[in-house]
Amino acid sequence: MLTLFIVLFIVLCGVAEPPAQASELPIIKDSPIPDFQNRPQDVTLYDFDAPPQGLFRAITTSEGFDEELGFHRTHEIVPVKPTNRFRPDTPAIFIVFHLHQHYQGFQVFGRCFPEAVAGLDPTVVIGQDAMHIALEDESGYLTLSPPQDAWKPGRYKVEIHVGEQVNEMSLMGTMRFTIAAASEE
């Protein structure tokens, strides 16, 4: 009786039939590498004429900065009155930034050029600053002072470089700010 029950169970469950064979997959020709890797439509070009990205979590121009105790009990630099429009009598313009995690120290450089300022050559550096970033630093700032006693009205750009020295390979991006004429305030 038991053997009859086992035979019926096997027949009803379909175990007695041979397993169905999977159909063979067709053999296809190898695809060329450009069809699936390094495709032009997948690549977005990095814009060096825009605020830096990648290493920088946030970067802004401001009228000042403050130092606070950060989450990991580190010194965190925060912007005070962030803006990109300043008055001609502004004593200094600050570029405050927050960084992603990094595994060695480096320097952040800022080089200021008069992009659209009457009477100033746009190819001549009118101010620069650098800050050494230690391994434990998560934020920092650059200070730009006016070239004379006051800023001339117009638009300025600041090239942000990262590394040990400024060269064509160290450029990370560009920040811009405007000095408003006294009548525009």
Question: What feature does the model see in each segment?
Answer:
Residues E24-P153, E159-L171, M175-A181:
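Contiguous segments within soluble domain cores/interaction surfaces
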Residues V11-A16, G64:
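Intrinsic disorder/low-complexity segments
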Residues S183-E185:
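Short, solvent-exposed mixed-charge patches
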Residues T3-L12:
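Bacterial N-terminal signal peptides
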Residues A16, A20-A22:
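Boundary at the C-terminal end of the N-terminal hydrophobic targeting segment
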